[in-house]
Amino acid sequence: MSSYLKDIQIVCQHDLPWDKLSGCKILVVGATGLIGSCLVDILMFNPRRDYDVYAAGRNQERALKRFAAYAEDASFHFLKCDVTEPLQGDIQFDYIIDAASNASPNFFANHPVEVMKANINGITHLMDYGLKHGMKRFLFVSTGEVYGEWTDEVKDEKSYGFINVLNPRSCYPSSKRAAETLAMCYAAEYGVDVVIGRPCHTYGPFFTESDNRAYAQFIRNAVAGEDIVLKSTGLQYRSWCYVVDCASALLHILLKGEAGQAYNVADSTSNVTIKALAEIIAEIGGVQVTSKEPTAEERRGFSTIQRAVFDTTKLESLGWQIIPGTMRDKLEHSILSLR
């Protein structure tokens, strides 16, 4: 069994009120993405599972390959779904998790309109469907980028910084901010029970082929035995989180979070620069870190935020904690799972 699956099993033993899911139908949208697929894995590996999991995504071929282990399981279902269009069907989902989003810099640079539509139209269509079909709770997977640029040493959930709304790169944080507000509007006007998770930069093994975020490129290089190419100074200082810890946090928010609240998701033991991240991955992979000037297109997708360190006191009050191991351990688990 891979280290990743062992990590999944640890989360399944966490003290969560799994009984809330008993007999329920759970929809995970964006199920083939890094975070969405990990949520599906935890829900399916849970030994106390007595619910149905619906994994929704645009690419059926990718989904069937990613979730091949569950193909014969009667409680697993794939649902072909593009969140930019209204959700079809008449299934009554008790819990909807919206983890659908284009979060790669190449999308920010080349398809900012589509990024905004997926975030804003996506939550609209899912909320409308949930309202019509008696949904119990909606979990929106947002981003720590909603805080914009700030001067605080560590960021809690109470205040927000500057986002340049005239910069197309702001398509991602601006649309996530708008989607959060829209979620609160559904709560106020229609009584929807909604909770929000704001993940920091998240890493793990099963990212998509099109993901060109720094961590994904670094891990690809290490797996292939190629030197890691750093295309910036690498001095941006960030909170990071292993995807299994992130998915665990989101399940704590789903099952124990207070309605109408947002929670930062980060590992306080994993605050490092991008350069340091590259060096850790290079050491694991036995390769070197080199540097190269980014192209104009790559530069357009870069975040201008230099420091993004998150306070997770609020999340920890729900009883969440990371699984045992250092950041290096979890990066190694990610790399070994892909070899």
Predicted regions, residues:
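N-terminal Rossmann NAD(P)H-binding glycine-rich loop of SDR-like oxidoreductase domains
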Residues: 26-45
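NAD(P)-dependent short-chain dehydrogenase/reductase
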Residues: 150-159, 181-238, 243-254, 279-284
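NAD(P)H-binding glycine-rich loop region in Rossmannoid oxidoreductase-like domains
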Residues: 80-118
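Conserved Rossmann-fold NAD(P)-dependent oxidoreductase catalytic core, especially the SDR/UDP-sugar
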Residues: 124-169
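C-terminal substrate-binding subdomain of Rossmann-fold SDR/epimerase-dehydratase oxidoreductases
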Residues: 224-339
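Conserved glycine-rich Rossmann-like NAD(P)H-binding loop of the short-chain dehydrogenase/reductase
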Residues: 48-63
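Active-site helix of classical SDR
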Residues: 171, 175-178
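Amphipathic terminal alpha-helices
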Residues: 1-20, 50-51, 325-339
